[in-house]
Regions:
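ATP-binding pocket architecture of kinase catalytic cores
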Residues: 1-39
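Hydrophobic packing residues in well-ordered alpha-helices of helical domains and bundles
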Residues: 19-22, 70, 74, 192
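Active-site activation/catalytic loop segments of kinase-like enzymes and analogous catalytic loops
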Residues: 125-156, 166-183
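A general structural signal marking secondary-structure boundaries and capping sites
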Residues: 29-37, 84, 139, 177-181
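Regulatory N- and C-terminal appendages and interdomain linkers associated
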Residues: 193-209
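Hydrophobic alpha-helical membrane segments, chiefly transmembrane helices and signal peptide h-regions
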Residues: 1, 25, 98-100, 105, ...
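An alpha-helical support segment within catalytic cores of ATP-dependent transferases
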Residues: 34-95
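Active-site acidic catalytic loop and adjacent metal/ATP-binding pocket
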Residues: 79-126
Length: 209
């Protein structure tokens, strides 16, 4: 569907009301199975989320710049990541790439998710958990976001899947951040390092809980 939306990207910072709207929209999407028209439209689309990984590769040759606390837990992280593909299936709507620049705060509709290039179905936790590191980058504390994931229906219903997904996602970021910079995207690797750090802070809290 193509629609005209009039407004800026939402503000994810702690002082903004936009994160509350976003979580309410995530609640709505995760509360019931995807409707038939949606499942028909995405049928046969492979889930990119199910293929996320990185820790197992880093375990074979740990980078010198890896935080010592993470280095000491590489075996545990690789094992946790390996459980994710078996948990990655579900019947909920999955956007698959939630960031502020894939949302618009329309003047009439409020916050709306856009750019559904990775749309598929899967467990309810994917979009909420993938948004969590973005909120930390926007200024929320890892402790606050960890509590939010513990309470949010999309991520609290199956905490094992949520933690496994976060492990796979952060491993993906850490692995990609250490690849050569692609031409035409000079800031990509620096961004990946930042979001990997944010995701790892959140993941560590969940693993220590």
């Amino acid at each position: 569907m193509i629609a005209h939306l009039d407004g800026p990207h939402p503000d994810l910072s702690p002082d903004s009301a936009d994160p509350g709207q976003i979580w309410a929209l995530l609640d709505k999407l995760a509360s019931s199975p995807a409707p038939p028209p949606y499942t028909t439209a995405v049928a046969g689309t492979p889930s990119g989320a199910a293929r996320l990984h990185g820790w197992a590769e880093l375990l074979t040759a740990p980078p010198g710049d890896l935080d010592p606390g993470i280095r000491d837990r590489l075996h545990e992280l690789a094992e946790l990541e390996a459980t994710w593909p078996g948990l990655a299936h579900g019947d909920r709507i999955v956007h698959g790439d939630l960031r502020a620049d894939n949302m618009v705060r329309d003047h009439h509709r409020g916050v709306t998710f856009v750019d559904w290039a990775h749309a598929t179905t899967g467990p309810a936790c994917i979009d909420a958990a993938s948004l969590a590191p973005q909120l930390i980058l926007a200024g929320h504390t890892p402790q606050k976001i960890a509590r939010l994931l513990d309470e949010h229906p999309a991520t609290a219903t199956d905490p094992r899947a949520t933690t496994a997904f976060l492990a796979a996602l952060t491993g993906h970021w850490h692995r990609n951040a250490r690849k050569p910079a692609p031409s035409g995207a000079p800031g990509l690797r620096a961004y990946q390092h930042r979001v990997a750090t944010a995701g790892t802070a959140l993941l560590t809290l969940r693993m220590n809980n």
